[in-house]
């Protein structure tokens, strides 16, 4: 009997990574291969650094101290120990370990940054990062400690320790000493760090970039699910489709507004519930203004994606080493661009969650539109879904606090030498936490929409949303007696974050 061989596509890394490739590597654990041409660029940069070092000139972080100690000149015999001292002294993170997808992203983005050929590291460093990705050796990196300038020094120090056989790492679900994790994966740690290699590993935006990237990937899934579930609510409330008329949106042609209106028209096409309520000439804003509310959210997602695409293919090191041998000191490690993108994303997601809470409130108080109070079978004896809105309101309140920008709250470090930090990692973490809350708010609206449609009959839904409704009905029970819905809400939120709703409908 012949065994079928399934070939898994390998993604080649050459310093030009697409967001689609990054998503496949980070979330689907697709295998990678480093292109020979990129390794040649790495070799050239390393040789250029050694030539510059041989000229005896001071080079920041290579033969000098770091930060406020940069005026201290380091003698040649101590240059390698300087790099090891750096990563040990900077590993001061606290808090819970970062989840595996974010750590995979950090490994990937640090590796891809080195493939720009401007960091001066040896190919052995690059290849070990690639092997750790391949064999799923994930450094244990605490979530707190980065101020988002001079790169993500603290989290990346915890990563760097594993490369030299120190620190801690997860391998096959077990947390181990870093050297043991490498050994079990059949890998060997670096026996020493050459000049600049410790600094190159630490001095970059890879941690805040990975947190923001993972948030953005899931945010797109949540947004698409939210649009489909809003379409269910729209029908349950018998909303008017007149505000979706393309002629209206051509008069205010913001791309996101036009896109969302078009998506809603497609989702609601052939519905037998829309345009059946005649009790008012206009619907509430959370229905009527869906394109104007969610269109800007769509545009933020598009803009953040463009920022991520540039950043993941950038050299975010300092100093940088040009192939011709010149060493330039600068600030490519500074995370301000990511901090602002993360703040914008967090605010946009908060708005998305707020709109879910408002439609949920409409569904629970829609007696004039033919639905029972709180969607209860026997109002009074049963509270129905009354408390869903409480939870949604609590999540909105939390998100409104998290949406306050950390990026405007810079705190100087290193004796004032680093006097303007981005706080980009904090901004990215806030967006990540907001996203988790919004996924639950979308789930809360989904439960109410599923119950509300149950009173009308799913056969009246548009064909596109009928498929969404069927998927939700596999998890959400029909309208009935009071029951504990907390486990259901968790399952729906997980389905949404995994993209289980976005593939249904259109």
Predicted regions and their residues:
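C-terminal auxiliary extensions adjacent to catalytic cores
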Residues: 5-30, 36-41, 45-53, 162-506
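Glycine-rich, flexible loop motifs
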Residues: 6-56, 86-141, 234
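Polyanion/phosphate-binding surface patch
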Residues: 57, 72, 260-261
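FAD-binding core of FAD-dependent oxidoreductases
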Residues: 60-82, 89-112, 142-164, 180, ...
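Short, charged/polar low-complexity linear motifs in solvent-exposed/disordered segments
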Residues: 79, 86-87, 172, 421
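Short, surface-exposed linear patches
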Residues: 81-84, 129-130, 222-225, 418
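Well-ordered mid-protein domain cores that form the structural environment of catalytic cofactors
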Residues: 116-134, 138, 149-153, 161, ...
């Amino acid at each position: 009997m012949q065994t079928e061989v399934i070939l898994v596509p390998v993604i080649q890394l050459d310093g030009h990574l697409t967001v689609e490739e990054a998503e496949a590597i980070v979330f689907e654990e697709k295998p990678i291969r480093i292109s020979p041409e990129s390794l040649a660029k790495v070799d050239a940069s390393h040789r250029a650094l050694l030539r510059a070092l041989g000229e005896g000139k001071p080079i920041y972080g290579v033969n000098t101290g770091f930060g406020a100690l940069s005026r201290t000149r380091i003698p040649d015999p101590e240059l390698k120990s300087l790099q090891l001292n750096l990563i040990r002294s900077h590993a001061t993170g606290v808090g819970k370990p970062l989840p595996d997808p974010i750590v995979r992203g950090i490994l990937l983005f640090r590796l891809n940054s080195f493939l720009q050929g401007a960091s001066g590291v040896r190919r052995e460093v690059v290849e070990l990062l690639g092997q750790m990705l391949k064999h799923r050796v994930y450094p244990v990196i605490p979530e707190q400690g980065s101020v988002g300038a001079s790169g993500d020094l603290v989290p990346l120090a915890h990563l760097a320790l594993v490369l030299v056989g120190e620190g801690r790492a997860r391998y096959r679900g077990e947390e181990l000493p870093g050297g043991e994790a490498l050994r079990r994966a059949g890998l060997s740690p670096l026996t020493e760090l050459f000049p600049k290699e410790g600094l190159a590993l630490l001095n970059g935006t890879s941690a805040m970039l990975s947190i923001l990237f993972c948030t953005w990937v899931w945010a797109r899934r949540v947004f698409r699910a939210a649009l489909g579930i809003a379409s269910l609510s729209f029908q349950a409330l018998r909303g008017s489709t007149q505000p979706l008329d393309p002629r209206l949106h051509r008069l205010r042609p913001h791309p996101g507004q036009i896109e969302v209106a078009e998506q809603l028209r497609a989702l609601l096409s052939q519905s037998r519930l829309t345009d059946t309520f005649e009790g008012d000439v206009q619907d509430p804003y959370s229905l009527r203004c869906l394109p104007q509310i969610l269109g800007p959210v769509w545009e933020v997602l598009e803009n953040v994606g463009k920022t991520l695409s540039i950043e993941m293919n950038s050299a975010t090191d300092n100093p940088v080493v040009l192939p011709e041998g010149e060493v330039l000191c600068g600030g490519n490690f500074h995370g301000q661009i990511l901090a602002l993108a993360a703040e914008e994303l967090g605010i946009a997601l908060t708005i998305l969650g707020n709109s879910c809470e408002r439609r949920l409130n409409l569904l629970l108080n829609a007696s004039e539109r033919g639905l029972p109070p709180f969607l209860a079978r026997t109002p009074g004896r049963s509270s129905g879904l009354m408390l869903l809105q409480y939870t949604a309101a609590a999540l909105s309140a939390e998100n409104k606090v998290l949406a306050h920008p950390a990026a405007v709250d810079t705190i100087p470090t290193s004796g004032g030498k680093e006097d303007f930090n981005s706080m980009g990692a904090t901004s990215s973490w806030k967006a990540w936490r907001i996203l988790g809350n919004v996924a639950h708010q979308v789930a809360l609206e989904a439960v109410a929409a599923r119950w509300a449609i149950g009173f009308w009959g799913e056969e009246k839904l548009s064909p596109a949303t009928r498929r969404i409704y069927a998927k939700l009905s596999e998890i959400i029970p029909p309208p009935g007696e009071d029951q504990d819905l907390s486990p259901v809400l968790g399952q729906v939120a997980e389905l949404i974050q995994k993209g289980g709703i976005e593939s249904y409908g259109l």
